[in-house]
A protein has these predicted regions:
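Bacterial N-terminal signal peptides that target proteins for export
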Residues: 2-13
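Bacterial N-terminal signal peptides
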Residues: 11-21
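Boundary at the C-terminal end of the N-terminal hydrophobic targeting segment
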Residues: 23-27
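Alpha-helical scaffold domains
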Residues: 30-31
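Short, aromatic-enriched amphipathic alpha-helices that serve as compact interaction elements
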Residues: 35-51, 61, 65
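Short solvent-exposed beta->alpha transition segments
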Residues: 53-107
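Short beta-strand segments that buttress and anchor functional surface loops
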Residues: 111-113
Length: 113
């Protein structure tokens, strides 16, 4: 009886760990349930560990949350990657740390530094 419970617990734990590893490889999509500060955090954390999930996954995560008007100017994705790796933004890739401070917000906008 005890051995059977241990086997079931072990199988459940293995399935849980596998589901975590598969879900961590996914790029998050914009969702109204994600707060503006969380969006900034997702983008900065992705760039901080740019190649963690796969090559340039952090840049792709940042691109995924970019405003459609921004994408029109900075896209497609390949062009956006080159821009982020260029002189103006390269310090964001694999940066050591960051802080996010809210400067102000309303129902329609939020500003952070």
């Amino acid at each position: 009886m005890m051995l059977e419970k241990l086997q079931i617990t072990s199988k459940t734990l293995i399935i849980f760990l596998l589901s975590i590893s598969f879900s961590s490889a996914e790029i998050l999509n914009p969702d109204s349930a994600i707060s503006p500060k969380e969006v900034v955090s997702i983008q900065l954390s992705g760039l901080q560990k740019n190649d963690l999930k796969y090559k340039d996954s952090g840049i792709e995560q940042t691109w995924n949350f970019a405003h459609p008007n921004n994408k029109k100017v900075t896209g497609p994705l390949g062009k956006f990657k080159r821009m982020i790796k260029g002189a103006s933004y390269q310090m964001m890739i694999d940066h050591l740390s960051h802080t996010i401070t809210e400067l102000g917000s309303s129902d329609k906008w939020a500003q952070f530094e």
